[in-house]
């Protein structure tokens, strides 16, 4: 489990951006304050940031893929992603990586709430 809050925040941001692009209607409509100034919509869904070991993250990734959920959106963040300086480098490294070479440091999942809670219920919020 990563302890550095800056790294955790960065990983969570990357995962959230991908989820936001891949899940329709995750971001709600804009709102307006009393002066009429617009504030862009934010997510309607809770996005808890949970702590887990690399092994647990890989286990969760494999578990959700095994369920064959039709509307599953799953994005992972590996040490390869963390260490790559450019997207081209990331793509090259991923293309040559075997599954055993992939060590996940984060995962973002959008699926049925019941399935997520069942799989992650034992994990604690990062504080």
Indicate where each model-derived feature is located.
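Short, small-residue-biased leader/transition segments that mark boundaries at the very start
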Residues: 1-2
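Short, well-structured hydrophobic secondary-structure segments
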Residues: 8-60
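Short basic, glycine-rich beta-strand/loop surfaces that mediate nucleic-acid
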Residues: 42-51, 71-127
